[in-house]
Amino acid sequence: MAPLNSQLRITGLGEEISALSNLPWEKPLEEWPEDPSLTAQRGISRHIVRLVRSTPDPESEIYAVKETVEEFATREYEALRELGLRGAPSVSQIAIVNGRLTPKGEELPCAIVTRFLPYSLPYRVVLSGDVTQHDITNMANALAYLLVRLHLLGFWWGDCSLSNTLFRRDADGFAAYLVDAETGEFQKNLSNGQREHDLELARFNVAAELEDLKLAGVLFPAMDPIRASESVITRYRKIWKALSEPQVLPANDRHAVERAMRSLQDIGFAVEEVDLQLAGDKSTLTFIPKLVAPNYHSLRLKELMGLETEEFQAKRILASFDRFRSREISRTPDKHEAAQRWLHEVFNKVVGSVPPDLQGRVEDAQLFHEILEHRWYLDRKSTRLNSSHSSVSRMPSSA
C-alpha cells in the first residue's frame, strides 16, 4: 500500500479512488508485479505501462497505469474525458496520480490511470496468431473508421498508430479504440491540412510497426507493410468521401435518395440531416450529407433490444432478427414484442448453449455471430457432401 504522505494526490472518478489508493504508488511502475495473464494484453508504449487489477479478485476491474509527465497526464485525462462525453471509441480516464515518493523520499513520475478495455487486444497479439490477408484488411479498415470518427468530432490525434490502438472482434472484422491521447487535441475547425497530417503519421507509423513484425518473423511472407499502411489511407478517403462529398442522382428515380442514405448506413453512419438541390433543368438531384452520426446499427439494436454491441455485430444481429420476423406465421405489428421473443427464443438459447467454463471469454454478441458462422459452415459442408453422394449414386455402374 502507498505510504500515507501529504504529497500523494489522486484526482479522478470518485467511485474508483478507494481501489486506486491500495496500489503500491511508492514503487517505480517497472517494479510493480503484473499478472502474467494480463501481460499478454498489454501493448508497447513509449512510456512504462502496467495492467493491474483493482482487487485480488480475478474478476475485478483492470486498470492501465502509465508513468508520464504531469502536463501530459493532465492533457490526456482531459482529452479522454471529452472523447468519452462525445461517444468516441476510446478508453476511459480514471485518475491522475502525482506527488509520488519512494520510502526514501525520492520523487517518482506522475501516473495516469485508464480503464482497460474488456475483450480487447493490442495489434501485436492479434497479428501473432494465424492471421490472413482478410484479417489485415479488416484491421486497416477498423483503424481508418476510428480516424474518421475522431476527425468528425474535430479531434486531431497527432500519433495515429497501431500501438496507440486496441482492437476488439466485431463480427467478421474488428473495432478499433483509441488508447493513447497524449498528443491529441480538439480543434474548433479541423482543417484539411490537419487531417492530412494525421494520415501521413498513420501511413508512416503503421508501415514501421508492421515492418518490425515482419523482421521479427511474425507476419506471413506475402504481407507488405507499406501496402497495408496505404490501405488504411485508401479506406479512410473512401469513407470520408462518402460522408462529405455531394452525389449527383437522377431526379426521376424516386429510390435514388433512399439508396444513397442506405449506402451510408451500410458503413455504419446514420444521415441525420441532408441537403438536396434540384438542377435547373430538373434532370438531377445533388445529395449532400450535412450531419452524419456513427453507430447506425448498434444504436438501432440498443433501442430495440437493449443490447450493447459493436457496429457490425449489431448489423448481424439485426439481420438475424429480420429473418426471424419474416418466418413468423402470425406477425405481430409490435416490433419490440417480436424483439423480446427473438431474444428469448434465439439469442439467449444460442449464447446459453456454451458450456459454463467457456462463458465470459468472448462478448455475447460476438459469440452469437461465431456460433451462427460455424453452423452456416457445417450446413454448407453437409450440403456439399449430400450433393456429392447424390451424384455418385446416379453414376452408371460401369463408372
Across the structure, where does each feature detected by a protein language model lie?
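C-terminal catalytic region of ATP-dependent kinase domains
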Residues: 175, 180-376
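Conserved protein kinase catalytic core
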Residues: 72, 121, 167, 186-188, ...
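Short, low-complexity Ser/Thr-rich regulatory SLiMs
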Residues: 100, 167-169
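Short acidic-glycine loop/turn motifs at beta-strand connectors
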Residues: 56, 169-172
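Hydrophobic residue at the +6 position relative to the catalytic HRD Asp in the kinase catalytic loop
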Residues: 160, 165-167
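Short, glycine/acidic-enriched loop or turn micro-motifs at the edges of active sites
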Residues: 118, 162, 183
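Conserved ATP-binding subdomain of kinase catalytic cores across diverse folds
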Residues: 20-133, 137, 142-157, 313-382, ...
